[in-house]
Amino acid sequence: MPGLKITLLQQPLVWMDGPANLRHFDRQLEGITGRDVIVLPEMFTSGFAMEAAASSLAQDDVVNWMTAKAQQCNALIAGSVALQTESGSVNRFLLVEPGGTVHFYDKRHLFRMADEHLHYKAGNARVIVEWRGWRILPLVCYDLRFPVWSRNLNDYDLALYVANWPAPRSLHWQALLTARAIENQAYVAGCNRVGSDGNGCHYRGDSRVINPQGEIIATADAHQATRIDAELSMAALREYREKFPAWQDADEFRLW
């Protein structure tokens, strides 16, 4: 059964400067080989700015860059960006394969405390991405607080969160990532940023990978620009779900 080698890039972001951020991640991705998935934070071209979509890089430019990096690393490159589309501005999680196939998920739960819901359009589609034998559920930041949206109907193996999650609520980030792994009997990975942004928000990172039993198998030091690696085991995941099949007793409802 295939394992999955995942890398999370916990990095600072340059406020509202797409080219500078792409140059920064060029340097971070240089020399990375032997990975299956490489994850960048939420809004990795701009930081969490409400006006980012209006002045953002075009989706084609971002996708072309991500495709080149996916080919360079022979890995799925994942991260969200603020984009202007024909139907409005979105916080779009892009997952790009080396062959150029593009998957995307538009953030469902918009962070009203920062007026995100006034500047961006909420997505309404839950997406599962199949990659190298794994089923991946992409989610963005505030989505983490809403467990129904990440409810595992035995349809995914890894929930992948990207975030700009502020330091004052870091305990929530850590606890909820663990809860999502335990309740869904799935791997969970959360890639958060570090540093400060143009709104004066501070971020400590705490990026991590958690196994289906809630054990942290890789974690980043707080406030550090760093990279963490983990290898996920499909055999261990299936064995646990077979030996402790709590998912079979889940309440029967769905909202999508």
From Swiss-Prot:
The keyword Hydrolase applies. The keyword Hydrolase applies. The active site is at 42 (proton acceptor), 107 (proton donor), 141 (nucleophile). Keywords: Hydrolase. It catalyses: a monoamide of a dicarboxylate + H2O = a dicarboxylate + NH4(+). Its EC number is 3.5.1.3. One of its GO terms (molecular function) is omega-amidase activity. NCBIfam families: PRK10438.1. Belongs to the carbon-nitrogen hydrolase superfamily. NIT1/NIT2 family. Hydrolyzes alpha-ketoglutaramate (a-KGM) to alpha-ketoglutarate (alpha-KG) and ammonia, has weak activity on L-glutamine, almost no activity on deaminated glutathione (dGSH) and none on glutathione. May function as a metabolite repair enzyme. PANTHER family: OMEGA-AMIDASE YAFV. This is Omega-amidase YafV. The lineage of its organism: Bacteria, Pseudomonadati, Pseudomonadota, Gammaproteobacteria, Enterobacterales.
